């Protein structure tokens, strides 16, 4: 998810302290108290990942229980994103106003309430409300947790401790998929899916009361003495004056830029923002949110017929996300973020084309990917019988279609209502030539069965797509953004790119099932593949190579107003370094 707005805050805080290395003291030491504090705070990451992944399996039961239409399923999924988008716009202000620790406590309590709401009040409305509150909770906690851990950690251990949150996110997604499988065949299993995580959220809220406030937040509020005491406890040393001075200098640097500078030519900030927004755009437009939210639904449609099989297959996606994230975290400094972005985008394109080609052979299975198959909503020709026929009260179009069709066959009929359900009483015409017969259930022939190799080819391609995203656009898009913006305006720049991220996530998730019904899943996948190719081209042309380079050097390169033009014209300043020395030396 995302939806990966959490990853952006992770990388932001991991790198922000390095923007002015000459002013930051070397903070050493990573005692048990710091590790414990980081683990407790990082539980928020587990909660975020769980909430992003659990709806995939819950929808398989909810769509039949609540008779959800295609559009209603999209709204259920997108409700979380609506809440997250709204929260992302004000999240930075809230954590600065009330504090990082207080925000985490609030979001944990809100998450408990939001998960229990649809369980206690089983209705479509309560489900939507609960998902919106969950979106608000995970968006705020994503920001607050990473900031809190980064501000507690010593500089030399900050990357490792903040990365713990990202690992917890993918672990939460895996946990959600496992729960989807375990409760797939349980009666009202969706209630267990929603309720299982609430005790952990409640325990985190209680545990956070015993952890210290962020020293940076205390200094921002003028409590320098309290901040000094917290640092002494965290660093196990009395010499904290140098670090206090560095924190104050960092806070002062944030006021050198104004928000509107992001849209101006100062230091070529407008071009930098364009790069950041485009990367956020590609994170979502390549289809990753739909693989996350609709994994079980899609896998069920390609031949994993039972709910349990689809949920088990989607669990593999969670495993791959966890395994793939580890090398991305530990090898990025050696390989480089741009290389990971290129490899990830290329593999994503190939994987999506593979799934699309397979799905062309199974098009009939995708046409009804999100329809509710109940007795009341089967097609007229497939379920028509004589006598009373019950039609769902919300299915006006089918009722009108039935009456029109019966009039054309000269059959007699009349309608009544019983307990809110329309009953259509049909009598066969005297002339049997009209062909009124009760159809026998269709028995699927062996030729209609989906070949095993196609099912597993589709699954393996989806796993390759997830792995490619987890080493590419997933974490690296936010890493690049953390390196292209100056420290003084980085937080405000991330607020804009975060809004783009959540907004595109909302748009993609809200339209996936509808567009799939309109054009078919194969063409949706081909469209995502095309966007992956576009992402590859964009990265090659416009994203700077940041491997092993100081942030000051990267910023200096991007500050050149002709940077974008030079990229389009394939002119790179590095070529000047390849000029033989003999050609520029004067003759002796």
Curated annotation (Swiss-Prot):
Keyword Transmembrane among record annotations: yes
Q: Name one GO molecular function term.
A: D-glucose transmembrane transporter activity
Family (UniProt) = Belongs to the major facilitator superfamily. Sugar transporter (TC 2.A.1.1) family. Glucose transporter subfamily.
Task: State the organism of origin.
Answer: Xenopus laevis
The name this protein carries in UniProt is Solute carrier family 2, facilitated glucose transporter member 12
Output the superkingdom of the source species.
Answer: Eukaryota
List the Cytoplasmic topological domains. Answer: 1-28, 96-103, 153-158, 213-272, 333-339, 481-492, 544-588
State the Gene Ontology BP annotations.
circulatory system development; D-glucose transmembrane transport
Record field: catalytic activity: D-glucose(out) = D-glucose(in)
* UniProt membrane topology term: Multi-pass membrane protein
What this chain does, per the record? Insulin-regulated facilitative glucose transporter.
